[in-house]
Amino acid sequence: MEDLYSIHPGISRGGGGGGGGAASEASGVAGGGSSPPHPPPPATTAAAADLTELMKAQIAGHPSYPSLLSAYIECRKVGAPPEVTTLLEEIGREGRGGGGGATAGGEIGLDPELDEFMETYCRVLERYKEELTRPFDEAASFLTGIHTQLASLCGGAPPPTDNSDEMVGSSEDEPCSGDADAADFGQEHSSRLADHELKEMLLKKYSGCLSRLRSEFLKKRKKGKLPKDARSALMDWWNTHYRWPYPTEEDKVRLAAMTGLDPKQINNWFINQRKRHWKPSEDMRFALMEGVTGGSSSGTTLYFDTGTIGP
């Protein structure tokens, strides 16, 4: 609690003669601030230590010190774990039990400046505690609301409230607990049945709209990029048949079964892929020319992107 004793270094020393002597010595030290920097003499250091001890004694002996200590502990308890909270409460009880004494500042009115400081600092700590507590309260309220919404969506019961009138019943209501449980079960069953009927009714009423939305979504999806898995399967086939990347109709059927695409999408993908990333080698061109010029009698047909070449 050292920070509670050093919070007001400017407190005036009212009361006993010892305090006045210490204050005069401290003022003498403050008055010599313009002297060249050098280590203070031992007497000045002792006087400053005595002044600090006197300030601590005045704060600890003030009638408002228990309130100041309680406000400080309340600030430290915000967000603290249970074991730390218990320890802080014990410290607070000890401080309230041992606070107050026959020191120089033991009565209100002897030192108005100290009285004003103690009152002001208590108010500051109380406002600070409110600011610290507000985020925790907002977070707890948000979590409670989310829990209630999830429970309502899942068909479960809402979280229990803290209302003591609802949680605690009288002895006259105890004999009827079985009837109350049966009534609650019946109400819960009827509410679930009503929810199921409502879902069925909405599904029947809007099933056509849902089907149209699904078909429109699939159309838009087809117009966009192909799925990643489908493109991977097509690229695997492309890399395997890179020398002649012209899938047959059987290949297209197999690829359609693997990717879930229709043959038109597969055909368009291969056309675009060949235009962008494939160019036949010189040997392939020579073989194609031989097939065109000398292979007409065999009845074969060569397929290209722009059409067909054959008999």
Swiss-Prot record:
DNA-binding region: 218-281
Stored CDD domains: homeodomain (cd00086)
GO molecular function ontology, one term from the record: DNA binding
Ranges where the record places region Disordered: 1-45, 153-184
InterPro entries documented for this protein: ELK_dom, HD, Homeobox_CS, Homeodomain-like_sf, KN_HD, KNOX1, KNOX2, TALE_homeobox
Chain intervals with Gly residues compositional bias: 12-22
Superkingdom of origin organism: Eukaryota
Domain ELK: 197-217
GO cellular component entries: nucleus
Keywords attached to this entry: DNA-binding, Homeobox, Nucleus
Subcellular localization, as worded in the UniProt entry: Nucleus
PANTHER family, alphabetized: HOMEOBOX PROTEIN TRANSCRIPTION FACTORS
Family: Belongs to the TALE/KNOX homeobox family.
Purpose of the protein: Probable transcription factor that may be involved in shoot formation during embryogenesis.
Protein name: Homeobox protein knotted-1-like 10
Gene that this sequence comes from: OSH71
